[in-house]
Regions:
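Glycine-rich beta-alpha loop elements in corrinoid/cobalamin-binding modules
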Residues: 47-164
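Conserved SAM/AdoMet-binding glycine-rich loop
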Residues: 1-4, 8-11, 228-376
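Glycine- and acidic-residue-enriched helix-capping/strand-helix junction motifs
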Residues: 16-31
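Flexible glycine/acidic-rich beta-alpha junction loops that bind and position SAM and/or redox cofactors
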Residues: 18, 81-82, 117-119, 205, ...
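Catalytic cores of alpha/beta
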Residues: 118-125, 299-303, 373-391
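Canonical Radical SAM [4Fe-4S] cluster-binding loop centered on the CxxxCxxC motif
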Residues: 183-222
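Short helix-loop-beta junction
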Residues: 32-45
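N-terminal [4Fe-4S]-dependent radical SAM core
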Residues: 15, 145-194, 203, 237
């Protein structure tokens, strides 16, 4: 058992997953859970972001490491992106960090980036180093209780405990974007609503979320209580995260149906419950599955109305079409086709294009494309552009268009010329 007078260094390497975001000004939930474990064990620790670490001199880094008796880092950036206020830790930086750690202290690296690096052969040589491929927080908890490392998953009770303790942990109160009582910063608190994906049986081949299995929901009451604790220490802005699809929170038929039926009541209870706290300012959400919306228009309409009523203007529902090419859709088990996308876009536009108090549309879709998926051909990019032109001609609004390149092994090479032409055409003629 680890003594509680130890002092650990918790390094936030940031996470960027399909359903989790923790790059500033966002603070992710996995790093907070890690801090929640240390809070529960009453172990002293220091929280730093990777950007704060980068600004330290060699002398300052040596001094920090000299005083710690344990180290834990979350590296969860598996979705490539462009960032404004921070950059996730890289594999190279992680290797350098490991080489610089005192050899006698235990060190834990976790997050989906670590899992991906490990599968690609990343195996740093160091005594008492553990690369977690399950729940980093539960793995740390097991070590603190037994003194030995093994992969572990958190229970639902631990989930609640560490989420609530993490809400008031140093990952929040010492985050550089929290600001002061006199002048609050832009910190946005990403709260985990559920984990897993309703397409767990046959999800998108490039995505990590189906690998997490059948969705496990948190109750509205549990989430609301966690956010209240965060408000107590100065948090003002919240985004509902962890959801691969806002519309399938506590949906019906998740294990039986290809298109589970959205359940309007729980998400309404959660959103209205969060809004009852006057300390909450910005409230946004993340993902939506166009096929679920298109195949369940009636309950999806009710949920859309609730989102428009409770979310702050400027809210985005990320729609992962990825490709308009039926060939790519079939080979990669994508979650919606162009027809379903159009149906979902029409519904969101019908209610979400009204402008809020800041002058922004209340709720609009964001559209995601991924280049390099199997089955892609030269015509794929023409199909993508033609679809966007059809949406524009119909007068449907999008909040933004993300164009990314697939990460990982087992995918085909991207035709650079066609890809660049597509990106330029989108930015010049659609955006």
């Amino acid at each position: 058992m680890v003594e509680n007078d130890d002092s650990w260094l918790v390094l936030d390497g940031y996470e960027d997953e399909p359903a989790a975001f923790g790059v500033p000004p966002y603070v992710g939930f996995h790093i907070r859970y890690v801090c929640g474990v240390l809070e529960q064990h009453k172990i002293d620790y220091r929280y730093m972001t990777i950007d704060q670490w980068r600004l330290c001199s060699e002398v300052e880094r040596e001094q920090i490491l000299r005083d710690v008796s344990g180290f834990v880092c979350i590296a969860g950036a598996v979705v490539p992106g462009r960032y404004i206020r921070g950059t996730p830790i890289s594999q190279r930086e992680s290797s350098e960090l490991i080489r610089g750690l005192p050899r006698e202290i235990p060190a834990l690296f976790g997050g989906w980036a670590v899992r991906g690096w490990k599968q690609q052969g990343w195996m740093p040589l160091r005594p008492n180093l553990f690369l977690a491929v399950q729940d980093t927080d539960a793995t740390l908890n097991g070590f603190l209780k037994t003194g030995s490392w093994k992969h572990e998953r958190r229970t639902s009770e631990q989930w609640t405990t560490w989420a609530q303790l993490g809400a008031q942990s140093k990952a929040v109160v010492n985050h550089p974007d929290l600001g002061t009582e006199e002048k609050r910063g832009p910190l946005t608190y990403e709260v985990e609503v559920y984990q897993g994906c309703v397409r767990f049986k046959r999800g998108c081949k490039f995505c990590i979320e189906p690998k997490k299995g059948v969705p496990i929901w948190r109750t509205p009451e549990d989430i609301i209580q966690e956010v209240k604790f965060a408000h107590d220490v100065g948090v003002q802005h919240v985004r509902l995260g962890g959801m691969t699809d806002t519309y399938t929170y506590m949906a019906e038929g998740v294990k039986e149906l290809e298109y589970p039926i959205p359940n309007p009541e729980p998400i309404a209870k959660l959103l209205h419950g969060l809004r009852e706290d006057e300390r909450l300012q910005i409230l946004h959400t993340d993902n939506g599955n166009p096929s679920i919306i298109a195949e369940n228009i009636e309950p999806s309409t009710e949920i859309t109305k609730t989102l428009v009523e409770t979310l702050s203007d400027g809210a985005v529902l990320s729609f992962g079409l990825e490709s308009a090419d039926p060939n790519v859709h079939a080979e990669n088990w994508l979650n919606c086709d162009a027809s379903q996308l159009k149906s979902a876009l029409r519904l969101i536009n019908q209610y979400g294009r009204v402008r809020g108090e800041r002058g922004l549309p209340k709720l609009l879709p964001g559209l995601n494309f991924i280049a390099g998926l199997n089955g892609e051909r030269t015509e794929t990019y023409s199909m993508n552009l033609n679809l966007l032109q059809e949406l524009r001609n119909e007068g449907l609004l999008l909040r933004r268009i993300n164009i990314r390149q697939v990460e990982g092994e087992g995918f085909q090479e991207i035709p650079e010329l066609e890809f660049k032409k597509f990106k330029s055409a989108v930015r010049d003629t659609i955006d």
